[in-house]
Amino acid sequence: MFQTFRKWFWSERYWLPPTIKWSDLEDHDGLVFVKASHLYITIPYAFLLMVVRYFFEKFVATPLANALGIKKTQHKIKPNAILENFFKHSTSKPSHTDIYGLAKKCNLTERQVERWLRIRQKQNKPCRLQKFQESCWRFTFYLLITMAGAVFLYDKPWAYDLWEVWNDYPRQPLLPSQYWYYILEMSFYWSLVFSLSTDIKRKDFLAHVIHHLAAISLMSFSWCANYIRSGTLVMFIHDISDIWLESAKMFSYAGWKQTCNTLFFIFTVVFFISRFIIFPFWILYCTLILPLHYLEPFFSYIFLNLQLMILQGLHVYWGYFILKMLNRCIFTQNVQDVRSDNEEEEEEEEEEEAESTKGKETEYLKNGLGTNRHLIANGQHGR
């Protein structure tokens, strides 16, 4: 049964243009062609990247965060077995009846119980240091892979002449630079998938899962069908905007608000140029229109462009939130990240600390969230 499925899955009619056979893509005369087995190494490399990330966050990102004044927030409370048991088994916001009953059991005031539960909830939420570490790691990878991509592509004719993307397709040998560009990029996305359970949970969690899996699927498919030339162009224009996003988030967590806003505006410009001009009018034109001058439409051609259009749909999704943030910046005084992490704003944390020292709950209500024109309150995150 497995052999039957394997034969069906790798049928040439699904992957290659008519008249082309897998035997045409066998290595010969020192030329190496893509093989699906090349991608197996991306899984162990993904775990290796996770190890590198651990040491990077510990020995590079954390000292950098400390130098920028970002410290690990400590939320300390007195141990209380009754309240701890209630907290672990409660799935919703405690009602007034719950608070009243707990106060009686623990011989505490209702206000003390509410404050204990609120602080205990904060202990389970990521602090600014953890968010900075994540952004610093992503910024470093995107910066290095974009620089590598620029080096790999600058002397390639298909980077300047899109017709060269399809010249002699699919009999295009694999270059060492293309191999490492793909392997590192795919390994990174696998590492993001594997770390989803431990990374900071965000409101657009599902969109991130779809994005990561779509990226891996697109890269895997383009590799197996030998769409390497167009694939490297897609990866490069996607990585280049993420550098600015992650750097803006880093400065947001550090409290460098003017720098953060400047970087966010640069990110916005780069994002819309790369995702709404270059991608649809250059990349999609290259993959959707130009091949028809060489080949008749076939399955992998259709499937490739279907995946690229799904990717463009995600661009529209994230572009909507970016425009929404800019709209708040221009027309309102209170700017929040509409797709930020599921946690309170940093200003709210400061106000709660003031409440605990002064013992006045009304102080928190009066202060509110402030009117800071800060574009990325808790770090806009999206690809």
UniProtKB/Swiss-Prot annotation:
Q: Which GO terms describe its biological process?
A: ceramide biosynthetic process; cornification; epidermis development; sphingolipid biosynthetic process
Annotated TLC domain ranges read 130-331
**Hey, what tissues is this thing expressed in?**
Predominantly expressed in testis. In skin, present in the upper stratum spinosum and stratum granulosum (at protein level).
Q: Which GO terms describe its molecular function?
A: DNA binding; sphingosine N-acyltransferase activity
Membrane topology type: Multi-pass membrane protein
Which ranges make up the Cytoplasmic topological domains here? 323-383
Supply the enzyme class, top level. transferase
Q: Where is this region: Disordered?
A: 340-383
Q: Please give the GO cellular component terms listed in this UniProt entry.
A: endoplasmic reticulum; endoplasmic reticulum membrane
Biased composition of type Acidic residues is found at 342-354
Task: Kindly indicate whether the keyword 4Fe-4S belongs to this entry.
Answer: no
Q: Which UniProt keywords apply?
A: Endoplasmic reticulum, Lipid biosynthesis, Lipid metabolism, Membrane, Phosphoprotein, Transferase, Transmembrane, Transmembrane helix
Location(s), subcellular: Endoplasmic reticulum membrane
Question: Which reaction is catalysed here?
Answer: a very long-chain fatty acyl-CoA + a sphingoid base = an N-(very-long-chain fatty acyl)-sphingoid base + CoA + H(+); docosanoyl-CoA + sphinganine = N-docosanoylsphinganine + CoA + H(+); tetracosanoyl-CoA + sphinganine = N-tetracosanoylsphinganine + CoA + H(+); hexacosanoyl-CoA + sphinganine = N-hexacosanoylsphinganine + CoA + H(+)
Quote the EC number: 2.3.1.24, 2.3.1.298, 2.3.1.297
Designated name of the protein: Ceramide synthase 3
Lineage at the top is:
Eukaryota, Metazoa, Chordata, Craniata, Vertebrata
